[in-house]
Amino acid sequence: MSGNTGERSFADIITSIRYWVIHSITIPSLFIAGWLFVSTGLAYDVFGSPRPNEYFTENQQGIPLITGRFEPLEEQNEFSRRSQ
């Protein structure tokens, strides 16, 4: 048989009024803050990822796929020149 650590049981915590008063405010607040973080575009700025309309340039609408086995550096340089 295990000893008592003096901590409240999980059932006691989630059935208490105090738990639900605190979490009925914090859980929706976190959800709304996350939604605003993404919907305003701040997530793109913070993490440095391109926005959906910035993945490809106007003259390049596909991924730069290197197909040459023996000349990959030349193909990469060609893709770089085309994208500028």
Swiss-Prot record:
Note on how the cofactor is bound: With its partner (PsbF) binds heme. PSII binds additional chlorophylls, carotenoids and specific lipids.
Spans traversing the lipid bilayer: 21-35
Topological category with respect to the lipid bilayer: Single-pass membrane protein
Coarse class of the protein's main subcellular location: plastid
GO CC field: photosystem II reaction center; plastid membrane; thylakoid membrane
Record carries keyword Isomerase: no
Cofactor dependency: heme b
Binding-site positions, heme: H23
SUPFAM superfamilies the UniProt entry points to: Cytochrome b559 subunits (SSF161045)
Keywords from the named record: Electron transport, Heme, Iron, Membrane, Metal-binding, Photosynthesis, Photosystem II, Plastid, Transmembrane, Transmembrane helix, Transport
Keyword Transport listed: yes
Cited InterPro entries: PSII_cyt_b559_asu, PSII_cyt_b559_asu_sf, PSII_cyt_b559_CS, PSII_cyt_b559_N, PSII_cytb559_asu_lum
PROSITE patterns: CYTOCHROME_B559 (PS00537)
Localization: Plastid membrane
GO molecular function, one term: iron ion binding
GO biological process, one term: photosynthetic electron transport chain
Oligomeric and partner information: Heterodimer of an alpha subunit and a beta subunit. PSII is composed of 1 copy each of membrane proteins PsbA, PsbB, PsbC, PsbD, PsbE, PsbF, PsbH, PsbI, PsbJ, PsbK, PsbL, PsbM, PsbT, PsbX, PsbY, PsbZ, Psb30/Ycf12, at least 3 peripheral proteins of the oxygen-evolving complex and a large number of cofactors. It forms dimeric complexes.
Annotated family: Belongs to the PsbE/PsbF family.
Function comment: This b-type cytochrome is tightly associated with the reaction center of photosystem II (PSII). PSII is a light-driven water:plastoquinone oxidoreductase that uses light energy to abstract electrons from H(2)O, generating O(2) and a proton gradient subsequently used for ATP formation. It consists of a core antenna complex that captures photons, and an electron transfer chain that converts photonic excitation into a charge separation.
Protein name, entry field: Cytochrome b559 subunit alpha
